């Protein structure tokens, strides 16, 4: 993985004595890749790349976005029209969001069709399903943040869906909205979920997902 010139350098030796870089490098480069693996096995990795793009562009927009019902829409317009390359950052965020959902769906189909969910990879499949739910939840919460007509009514419809659940439905609706109706508390909740709760959740389950894949390897052909 590293050239002889690099491994012989004093800087490399200093880090290797403390972090065992060479052992980590050997473990990565010696991992067996089955011969049946093709481009469709890259869909999960592409989904990860889309998430990283989402994280970077979303973080950039938090410097200008204002999560209030009176300023949310105008702050998005400011990002699009006044911030240097703001239109590009937001557009990339939107495009990569759509791409992430698409790649996630294709990845789920690939795993299912190739039997990658079978023993001993049941837990890997379960964490993947959880990641899929979080990904869709990202889309739902992010869709509302511009707080335009589309976002507002999307929130109103989505947050009203749990009302059909017996016994606890009305309580769930009130929890999502932060009250009886859609308003500032609703936007605050969705913003918090989108920028803090879901990123942490997806990072934790991604780590678990990748560690299990690393431990068990790629499933064999059907």
UniProtKB/Swiss-Prot annotation:
Top-rank taxon, per record: Bacteria
Residues given in the record as heme b 2 binding sites: 93, 194
InterPro entries: Cyt_b/b6_N (IPR005797), Cyt_B6_PetB (IPR023530), Cytb/b6-like_sf (IPR027387), Cytochrome_b_N_euk/bac (IPR048259), Di-haem_cyt_TM (IPR016174)
Pfam families listed in its UniProt record: Cytochrome_B
Cofactor note: Binds 2 heme b groups non-covalently with two histidine residues as axial ligands. Binds one heme group covalently by a single cysteine link with no axial amino acid ligand. This heme was named heme ci.
UniProt main location, coarse: membrane
Annotated heme c binding sites: 42
Key words of the record: Electron transport, Heme, Iron, Membrane, Metal-binding, Photosynthesis, Thylakoid, Transmembrane, Transmembrane helix, Transport
GO BP annotations, alphabetical order: photosynthesis; respiratory electron transport chain
UniProt key word Heme: yes
Key word Iron present: yes
Residues at which heme b 1 binds: 107, 209
GO molecular function: electron transporter, transferring electrons within cytochrome b6/f complex of photosystem II activity; metal ion binding; oxidoreductase activity
GO CC entries: plasma membrane-derived thylakoid membrane
Cellular localisation: Cellular thylakoid membrane
Topology relative to the membrane: Multi-pass membrane protein
Stretches that traverse the bilayer: 39-59, 97-117, 123-143, 193-213
Additional remark text: Heme 1 (or BH or b566) is high-potential and absorbs at about 566 nm, and heme 2 (or BL or b562) is low-potential and absorbs at about 562 nm.
Similarity field: Belongs to the cytochrome b family. PetB subfamily.
Assembly description: The 4 large subunits of the cytochrome b6-f complex are cytochrome b6, subunit IV (17 kDa polypeptide, PetD), cytochrome f and the Rieske protein, while the 4 small subunits are PetG, PetL, PetM and PetN. The complex functions as a dimer.
Protein role: Component of the cytochrome b6-f complex, which mediates electron transfer between photosystem II (PSII) and photosystem I (PSI), cyclic electron flow around PSI, and state transitions.
PANTHER family referenced in this protein's UniProt entry, alphabetically: CYTOCHROME B (PTHR19271:SF16)
UniProt-recorded name of the protein: Cytochrome b6
Gene: petB
